[in-house]
Each structure stands twice: as structure tokens, then as C-alpha cells.
Amino acid sequence: MKAIKQKKQVLDNSMIEYEFFEDAMLIGIVCPLPSYQFVWRINKAFNYMFERTHEFEVEVKNEFYEVYCFAEEEKLIEHTIYVNRKNTHFLLDEIKHIDFIWMIKGGALPQEYTTQLLMYLNEVNAVVHSFVLNPQQLKSKHLLIL
């Protein structure tokens, strides 16, 4: 009797990724502070209430990367800050120069919102630089889907 070779089935997540990032804006932030100090400064500067969300921590290669969340419910906007650097490891290896990733999802975000956010963010003490990231250029963007 001839053995039947089974095919491996591979799940194509490209459509899920596309839909997830369709209404998202990503900001890369260079800041040498520990995550709790960085988030505290963001909360003070923007009058936000980011909180660490333990159930949404991202694990990659036995390293846990913190996630901080805040929702502007009246505007239907969700803010998420991911820690990208943990000691000498990175959540997204392709952007090793970035310490934090700030994702903003929901609502129609006008261009002036982005411009003002970057301007104010660059004024936060200890933030060296911040800029918009293109999620389509990130190979491991699936790690940002919670």
C-alpha cells in the first residue's frame, strides 16, 4: 500500500495584517529612558492615562516586551505603546534603532493630528527623535497584533 503524503497547511495572515493596520498609525520613538519613566512623561505631557497591560505583553524568544494602553473613548481612538528594546533584544529586529513604538488606531486621523503629535512628542524631555513608521515595510509587524 502506498503511503499518502500529507500537505502542510499554512495560514495566510496577510489579510488579517492588512485589515489590522489599515486604520493604524505607527510612530517610532528614540528615547533612552526605561519604559515606566517614558510612559510617565507621555502621560504628563499629553494628559493621558497609559497603563501597563500585563495580559497583552508580547513574548519573543523568551523575552517579554511590555505594552501600555490608553483609549480615548469619546474619539474612538486606541493608543498602544510597545517597548521595542529589552536589554540587547528587540521586539522588531528590523528597527533596532527605535526604543518604543506608539500605535494609534481608530477614527479618521487628519494629517495635522500626526504633525502636532510628532511636534509635541519631540518636545518631551528625553525623547531624542520620533517619526512615522510605514507598517507595510515592517517584516515582523504581526507581533504588534494583540
How would you describe each model-predicted region?
Residues 2-46:
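N-terminal, charge-rich interaction modules
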Residues 17-20, 54-55, 59, 93-95:
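Conserved functional micro-motifs across diverse proteins
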Residues 10-11, 17-19, 42, 67-72, ...:
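Noncatalytic linker/hinge segments flanking ATPase motor cores
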Residues 109-146:
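Glycine-rich, aromatic-bearing surface loops/beta-hairpins
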Residues 23-26, 97-101, 141:
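Short, surface-exposed beta-edge/turn micro-motifs
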Residues 1, 51-53, 58-65, 78, ...:
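Acidic, serine/threonine-rich, charge-biased low-complexity segments
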Residues 69-122:
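Amphipathic protein-protein interaction modules
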Residues 30-74:
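Short, well-structured hydrophobic secondary-structure segments
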